[in-house]
Amino acid sequence: MTDRYAVFGHPVAHSKSPQIHATFGRQEGIAVDYRAIDLAPEAFLAGLEAFAADGGVGANVTSPHKEAAFSVCTTLTARARRAGSVNTLLRKGDRWHGDTTDGIGLVRDLTDRHGLDLRGRRMLLIGAGGSARSVAPALLDAGITELVVVNRTPERADELIDAMGEPGRAISRYWEDLRDLGDFELIVNATSAGRDRDIEFKLPLSLVNSMTTAVDLNYGEAAIAFLAWARAAECRNTVDGLGMLVEQAAESFLQWHGVRPQTDEVYQSLRQGSAVLAGED
């Protein structure tokens, strides 16, 4: 039976992951069978087991399944356990091993590709779902001075902060208090609100200072609304999630195939191959 790989999400037709892993496979001379599988939340667990029965040995997991994927894993990396979220699955025998590579992917993109020094920065994280949980630990480890999390459901923000285990550096605040939080050198949108094409981000301009970098973990059309606000607010840098996607994919590829591929080729190919993506940097 041929080893199979996939990305699970809902929706997932827009995903660039199959193209990315096909390119990585060609670079490394490895035949890769990787496809996108759309599963509604209530169908995820059964769909994942059907995938395993059909030769599935590795998978990426995107919204809204990252926390559900965490729950099915028998073993977890330390960073996945801390995040309470999984985006990379590896089949070991008849069980799943889980990791989260989003955080290290984001840090690699911001530091290596965009030349940012994250040390000493005050950061605002918007959202507290699986995507937010997957990047928060790595950003703290990269030297963020203070992490402030806001979410429309404050209990979710509190849960994320508790999971970080760093009460002196990571705090939650109410959405209604955004105007009173001061300014930040890094603002990260980890919500999926931008997938609603009619959405308009209306965040206080007081969040921005002369050094602010605004990052949307989404890419393509889903990142347009937040990054439009960031440009209007005159953020110094605006970054979408394409680079993070490529870097986290390379980390997943390493776990599945034992080699970490070079990422610049596929990043530039994706960036130049789409009119929407071409304007994001």
Swiss-Prot record:
Q: Which domain of life is it from?
A: Bacteria
Instruction: State what this protein does.
Output: Involved in the biosynthesis of the chorismate, which leads to the biosynthesis of aromatic amino acids. Catalyzes the reversible NADPH linked reduction of 3-dehydroshikimate (DHSA) to yield shikimate (SA).
Q: InterPro entries given for it?
A: Aminoacid_DH-like_N_sf (IPR046346), NAD(P)-bd_dom_sf (IPR036291), SDH_C (IPR041121), Shikimate_DH (IPR011342), Shikimate_DH-bd_N (IPR013708), Shikimate_DH_fam (IPR022893), Shikm_DH/Glu-tRNA_Rdtase (IPR006151)
Pfam families, from UniProt? Answer: SDH_C, Shikimate_DH, Shikimate_dh_N
- Please report the name of this protein according to its UniProt entry: Shikimate dehydrogenase (NADP(+))
Q: Which residues bind shikimate?
A: 15-17, 62, 87, 102, 219
User: Where in the sequence is the active site?
Assistant: 66 (proton acceptor)
E.C. numbers: 1.1.1.25
Enumerate the PANTHER family for this protein: BIFUNCTIONAL 3-DEHYDROQUINATE DEHYDRATASE_SHIKIMATE DEHYDROGENASE, CHLOROPLASTIC, SHIKIMATE DEHYDROGENASE
Q: Please give the catalytic activity noted in the UniProt record.
A: shikimate + NADP(+) = 3-dehydroshikimate + NADPH + H(+)
The pathway it acts in is: Metabolic intermediate biosynthesis; chorismate biosynthesis; chorismate from D-erythrose 4-phosphate and phosphoenolpyruvate: step 4/7
Please give the Gene Ontology molecular function terms for this protein. Answer: NADP binding; shikimate 3-dehydrogenase (NADP+) activity
> Which SUPFAM superfamilies does the entry mention?
Aminoacid dehydrogenase-like, N-terminal domain, NAD(P)-binding Rossmann-fold domains
Q: Which gene encodes it?
A: aroE
GO BP: amino acid biosynthetic process; aromatic amino acid family biosynthetic process; chorismate biosynthetic process; shikimate metabolic process
Do you know which HAMAP family this protein is assigned to? Shikimate_DH_AroE
Annotated NADP(+) binding sites:
127-131, 151-156, 217, 241
> What family is it from?
Belongs to the shikimate dehydrogenase family.
Q: Which CDD domains match?
A: NAD_bind_Shikimate_DH
